Amino acid sequence: MTNIWHTAPVSALSGEITICGDKSMSHRALLLAALAEGQTEIRGFLPCADCLATAQALRALWVDIQREKEIVTIRGVGFLGLQPPKAPLNMQNSGTSMRLLAGILAAQRFESVLCGDESLEKRPMQRIITPLVQMGAKIVSHSNFTAPLHISGRPLTGIDYALPLPSAQLKSCLILAGLLADGTTRLHTCGISRDHTERMLPLFGGALETQKEQIIVTGGQKLHGCVLEIVGDLSAAAFFMVAALIAPRAEVVIRNVGINPTRSAIITLLQKMGGRIELHHQRFWGAEPVADIVVYHSKLRGITVAPEWIANAIDELPIFFIAAACAEGTTFVGNLSELRVKESDRLAAMAQNLQTLGVACDVGADFIHIYGRSDRQFLPARVNSFGDHRIAMSLAVAGVRAAGELLIDDGAVAAVSMPQFRDFAAAIGMNVGEKDAKNCHD
């Protein structure tokens, strides 16, 4: 640990930000562009640690990628044009990079190894290994189906497969593998998960058929390079939405935010709590809906979150818990087993931090009760990001309603998904600074 973030409460928030490009879309654009023939230009690319891990892996597979700030140019190599890497491909902290790239590498004609940091190598990979092996892949994993993944590429055959959970990473892995396989791949989905891959593929000239709870992919297609504009990241915007809702005298505008209906549960849930959130200038960028979001300080109330909302809001739950702590009454969220196998055990980590901040909560194996108060002032305290970017940023938002300074261990881990977080925070009046850990004491 080399740094600590520190926050101070605010008397008001106001301002306007244009949020960074969407992380999920940036990953997918890189991968599809690499598989396409010809040149692709990606505008609004998110240069966060996770997406840069995907880019670096593709470079190691001999894909030409040039980046100038938020514009990335890629010369695609086609479905089987990737070349053997000289070393294991390090996905750092990015589960999306590992799971999606595994679907591509399984069909290549060479061997490769996917590894990551300590956190990533604890995350479950059986969900992708099982169907890829059914397609003909040869994958050797570490104990308990975790990374490193040793992949011996070989020709794949399409399968008929029922997804065991609503996971966009699993679904996208198999769509990519299906494109490279012989025959047809039929995926039977269970519940809603983000559909950026399905929306983006036709922009590259690819085709798939989407029916209710079924996706059909035919192998042997060709993709072609294109010019692609990445929408603003709703998961990133959610931090500033909650900051505006809980800060006094707040009015914040967030421009160009993607409002894909498979991602927008966080907006609905905050509105159900009484949050005043308005969507202005709704339009489309390519296949993705976009809006400018205006958020006002609001008196929130506790709610019970129905299970069907969880997959849609899984990445936003840490910041949602901060909103719940500032809502009057009890908020209940269940069906949270997936939250325990993210970059950290986010359920346990957020519960521990909430309690440190003076918030009463009860936690079970897959649920949490949060006992909120509309007059909440979080206790001044030192809290722990657990090396998790979304927890670090959620705790920074809590700082706007604290009774004094919050110290956040390893706040800089936010760069995994939003290196611009502190710049955006400053633009609307939040106080988030950084100091060296050796100068901080409990």
From Swiss-Prot:
Pathway: Metabolic intermediate biosynthesis; chorismate biosynthesis; chorismate from D-erythrose 4-phosphate and phosphoenolpyruvate: step 6/7. It is an enzyme of class 2 (transferase). 3-phosphoshikimate binds at K23, S24, R28, S167, Q169, D315, K342. The keyword Amino-acid biosynthesis applies. The active site is at D315. The keyword Signal does not apply. Gene3D superfamilies: Enolpyruvate transferase domain. GO terms for cellular component: cytoplasm. GO terms for molecular function: 3-phosphoshikimate 1-carboxyvinyltransferase activity. Belongs to the EPSP synthase family. NCBIfam families: aroA. Catalyzes the transfer of the enolpyruvyl moiety of phosphoenolpyruvate (PEP) to the 5-hydroxyl of shikimate-3-phosphate (S3P) to produce enolpyruvyl shikimate-3-phosphate and inorganic phosphate. This is 3-phosphoshikimate 1-carboxyvinyltransferase. It comes from Dichelobacter nodosus (strain VCS1703A). The gene is aroA.
